[in-house]
Design a protein with these regions (language model features):
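Acidic donor-binding segment of Leloir-type glycosyltransferases
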Residues: 1-16, 61
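Glycine-rich, basic loop-to-helix element that forms the pyrophosphate-binding segment
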Residues: 18-34
């Protein structure tokens, strides 16, 4: 798939192949090799609208010199243009990713575009024999120090497949017990989360 793009030589592509060790290891490897200022994670089954990167660049201009921001974040949608998680009630919202869920109570996956330097600061933990670490383990840590600029534009088109990570989240947690215990234990200790969320995490932890 990638070879024809390399041969076209229209843009610079640094293609890295490694044994499947889970998405989190792929992200770590990508961050290690990344030379750009921003990092956009796009799953192999998904794609970007034609104006996606243009919209991202427009919003980056407003935060790129502000060290309190970890990046920008647009909305995800299905191929029919319906937003994942329903309506997004803001045009622009500057907040951290935990407050985004807990305070503003917004649902649905979002499309984060991170400053590469921030992801280098917060690499994903890796556990031998485990292939899954929920992204929230890292995103929640970043939220203690940085915020994101959320904007109400679809920049990412996705289809949730029956064998995808989101569809099988419980099974992935069972198959990666150390990573899952880390995730739940950190929520239990984190006062930013409401009591119900922390109780549910305690139940899942045990």
């Amino acid at each position: 798939v990638v070879k024809p793009w390399l041969n076209d030589n229209i843009i610079t592509i640094n293609y890295i192949k490694q044994k499947n060790g889970g998405k989190h290891r792929a992200i770590n490897k990508g961050i290690e090799a990344a030379k750009g200022d921003y990092f956009f994670i796009v799953d192999s089954d998904d794609f970007l609208p034609e104006d996606s990167l243009e919209l991202v660049q427009q919003h980056i201009e407003g935060i790129k010199n502000d060290t309190t921001f970890a990046g920008v974040c647009g909305t995800k949608c299905y191929p029919n243009n319906q937003r994942v998680g329903g309506a997004f009630p803001y045009e622009i919202l500057d907040t951290d990713s935990v407050s985004f869920r807990i305070v503003h109570k917004i649902k649905g996956d979002m499309a984060e575009v991170w400053k590469t330097s921030v992801l280098k600061e917060f690499p994903f933990p890796e556990f031998e024999g485990e292939k899954f670490v929920t992204e929230a383990v890292v995103w929640n840590k970043i939220a203690k120090k940085y915020k994101l600029r959320y904007f109400n534009k679809n920049i990412y088109i996705c289809e949730y497949l029956d064998d995808g990570l989101t569809k099988n989240i419980r099974r992935h947690h069972r198959n990666s017990p150390k990573a899952s215990q880390l995730f739940y234990s950190e929520i239990i200790k984190d006062n930013r989360f409401d009591k119900i969320t922390r109780i549910k995490s305690a139940i899942n932890f045990w």
